[in-house]
UniProtKB/Swiss-Prot annotation:
Superkingdom: Bacteria
Family: Belongs to the guanylate kinase family.
The name this protein goes by in its record: Guanylate kinase
SUPFAM superfamilies in UniProt: P-loop containing nucleoside triphosphate hydrolases
Origin organism lineage: Bacteria, Pseudomonadati, Pseudomonadota, Betaproteobacteria, Nitrosomonadales
Amino acid sequence: MSCLFVISAPSGAGKTSVIRTLLQTDINLTLSISYTTRPPRRDEKNGHDYFFVDHATFKDMQARGEFLESAEVHGNLYGTSRKWIEETMAAEQDVLLEIDCQGAQQIRTVYPQAASIFILPPSMEALKQRLEQRGQDENKVIERRLAAARSEISHVNRFDYVVVNHELETAARDVASIVQAERLKTIRQLVRQRSLIAEFS
């Protein structure tokens, strides 16, 4: 029985860095690559970071029901491939979704057993500094992201776990601990260790 993990955070909280660190040490975890209409950033590659598509293509895919979840974030559309998730989990591979709060709630509706993790920045000031240091956005865009962060953080009680990203390595270890604990839950071990348990019955 495979596990599905959902990680959400405000823009600038460091979730992408946490996930990259986690994936370097956990070969049994596969990151779902989302579709998006936003332009790629300087260091992003199509098919690796996102599948970059135009608005019309995204809307066509959405109309055909190809997305397990989709949402508009900061004026851009994002979606998760339904077929890819179903096939990967059917192959007994654990899946990690890096999505916004809207998408996280949609996923929980379809997969109530999914483990949801919210990554908090250590403070609003720290979040602002991180957004400024990225050098990607104008001041008005940063202010809009900070306002969105307040709204997103107000929904933190809907998540199973909360990790504060004071320091990258520590936050990544915290998330890794959550992943391991979920894998060891009885409902999953009864399936994975079926033959072992049968020896004692």
